[in-house]
Structure formats: C-alpha cells, structure tokens
Regions:
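Substrate-binding/active-site clefts of carbohydrate-active enzymes
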Residues: 1-23, 36-40, 44-49
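Residues that line or immediately flank small-molecule/substrate-binding pockets and catalytic motifs
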Residues: 32
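Conserved alpha/beta catalytic core and glycan-binding cleft of carbohydrate-active enzymes
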Residues: 24, 36-166, 170
C-alpha cells in the first residue's frame, strides 16, 4: 500500500481492515519505515493476512550484479539465500525504473512529465547495454534480452516471494 510518512498507524490499520473485509484481500506489501508489519499482524482482522515488507536490498544488489559491478558475488549469494518470510523479492517496482528501463538507460529521462526529472530515485543501478534509450542495433537488443532473462532467472532462483512489475514479463 502506498502510504506516506505522515499517515497515522490507525488510518493504515483502518484501510487494510477495509480491504480485507470488503474485498477479501489476503495480503499486503508495506514499507517497514512507514508502519511496522509485526504490529499489523497483531490485529485480529489482519492476523490471517500475508503482510510482506518492501525492502530495496534485493533489487539494488541484483541490479548492480547485472550491470557488472565488482565485488557483488557475496551480496548476491546472501540475497538469494535470504529466507525472511516477510520479505518479497523484486528487481523493478512502481517506484523507479521498469526492468526494460534498467537495461536501456544509464540515467533518468523524465523531463517530459513536468517534474523536472526529480521524480523517482536517482540511484537506479542501471546499464544501457551500449546505447541510451531505444535501439535498433541487433547486438544491443540481444544483450538487453539476455539481461532481462538473467534478471528473471535471479528473481525466480531466490528464496521467498518473487514480485514481477506488471508489464516486465513482456520485455
């Protein structure tokens, strides 16, 4: 749920309860810096719900590994073997680059949306595979396809719940 820092715990609790009771939602992803998942799990209405924590560690390590940063093997192994059942693993999310962007851009290019390129994180750990943005070069497009496949391999090989951003499965 996209709650912000100013959201009170009681409002978060009321919203999640509503989704469970009215729409029979059986799980949520929450930012542990905004609300404590353990506190949510104590609520009688939410007790049987799956409450997963959003944490960028897996995303950042895997992106750095995919783009070839040195010294990442140990971190990759630790992330792949992490068995925290409250975490979910992802390489792309609603906040930042899509998987296709990760292999197509070295930096943000959000100038056209009116936010002066200030939206989304500045640290995307991305690599454009030899050409910034869309490319028709066969070597670049093939490398990008391989990198996307590698990302899915790492994601699905990891322990825990994999999360794929809607649309990323199409490349």
């Amino acid at each position: 749920m996209p709650f912000t820092e100013g959201t009170t715990f009681s409002l978060i609790l009321d919203c999640l309860r509503y989704w469970v009771m009215q729409y029979h939602v059986d799980g949520f992803i929450v930012n542990p810096y905004i609300c404590n998942p353990d506190e949510l799990a104590k609520d009688p209405v939410l007790a049987k719900s799956k409450i997963l924590k959003k944490e960028d560690g897996f995303q950042n390590v895997m992106r750095r590994f995919l783009k070839g940063d040195e010294g990442m093997i140990r971190d990759v192994i630790c992330q792949l073997k992490n068995q925290d059942t409250q975490l979910y693993n992802y390489i792309a999310s609603h906040n930042g680059f899509t998987l296709c962007d990760v292999v197509s851009y070295d930096g943000k290019h959000n100038e056209a949306n009116g936010e002066n390129n200030l939206d989304g994180p500045d640290y995307n750990y991305s690599w454009n595979c030899g050409a910034e943005g869309p490319s028709r070069k066969k070597a670049v497009t093939e490398l990008r396809k391989h990198q996307i496949n590698n990302a899915f391999f790492l994601l699905l090989l990891s322990q825990g719940t994999p999360c794929i951003l809607a649309g990323d499965e199409f490349g």
